[in-house]
Amino acid sequence: MDYTFLKEDESFRSELHDFFLRELPDDWTGSLGDSESDWEFTLKIRQKMAQEGWLSMAWPKEYGGQEASIIKQVIFAEEVEYNRVPGRDAFGVRMLAPTLMIHGTEEQKREHLPKIARGEIQWCQGYSEPGSGSDLASLETRAVEDGDDYVINGTKVWTSMAHRADQMFMMARTDPDAPKHRGISFFLLDMKAPGVEVQAIINMVGNHHFNMINFEDVRVPKKNLVGEVNRGWYVGATLLDFERSGIEYSASARRVIEELIDFSNETYRNGCLISDDPIIRHRLAKLRTEIEMSRLISYQIGYMQSQGIVPNKESSIGKVFGTELQQKIAKLGMQILGMYGQLAVSYTHLPLPPSDLV
């Protein structure tokens, strides 16, 4: 593909930068907690981006989109992540919406896609379970057919944003006797349905992001089955292709490496600038090169999507490469920052803005 951006693409970047300067506080670092005021700010930014049509710009107009290029959508995702802008519901916008366009019924598309485009709804993902993580196909949550519904019982865990979510997309086992990849179905579930219990999982620094979800006789209408019964694995795999295909990995990594480079160029240790250490320079340069590789992989994936190609193996490559890259940057960041890396986010004299990586 041609990696040269059009003038209109660069103009769009400038438009996004102007929006960020206008809507974000002057001292914005990208760090938000889970307070009600933080969530309200997230929703406020989401609504403004939705009003601009940015959440769904590459979608068909009939579902709330602008039919813009996929590459333009990639630029939006990159700039939002690089600038640590809140508000974009990746579960709905990046993962579920394109999956519904492939596997959903017309009724499902018309019911859910416009709400996502307008920024009116928060989704969460019901995949991992206490006994099934990496081996997702070993999931045990059951969905039993009963009249016009399926009745769901089981548990999901590590569910991000479930305490804020209106809806969940999930996989459940509909045929326990079938081979494990064949007896799974994909559902859309109302988080306020009777029998849904959300339990907070508080991490070691006191943050609430993950949850455990218990389902006790939760009724899901058959119209909320996405794709064919017992073939939900393929729907879920499509969704994972979209989840893994994002440019977010390289964008967030690029922001952190630039901050580490600035810190190294400005900070003395043992009488010398940190950046004068040839080992540090080499490691920073190597990671900066790998970030550009990750970025180009994401652009290639975006190009494939623009040609109507589902980037199956390419998405997995991008996910593994991007995640490992972030881990390398976090490790180097801790080495460069030293004891500064142990400071709490609330500490007044943090040398770098708070980040998900360092």
Question: Which residues are covered by each model-predicted region?
Answer:
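Intrinsic disorder at enzyme termini
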Residues: 1-8, 344-347
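Glycine-rich beta->alpha junctions and the first turn(s) of the following alpha-helix
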Residues: 3-7, 196-293
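C-terminal helix-coil-helix/basic helical segment that borders enzyme active sites and/or dimer interfaces
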Residues: 28-36, 269-278, 292-347
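Internal helix-loop-helix
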Residues: 50-119, 161-167, 291, 305-313, ...
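A short, Trp-centered hydrophobic/proline-enriched beta-strand micro-motif
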Residues: 119-127
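A structural signal for short hydrophobic beta-strand segments in well-ordered beta-sheet cores
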Residues: 141-144
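A short core secondary-structure module
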Residues: 148-149, 153-199
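Conserved small/polar residues in nucleotide/adenosyl-binding loops
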Residues: 348-354
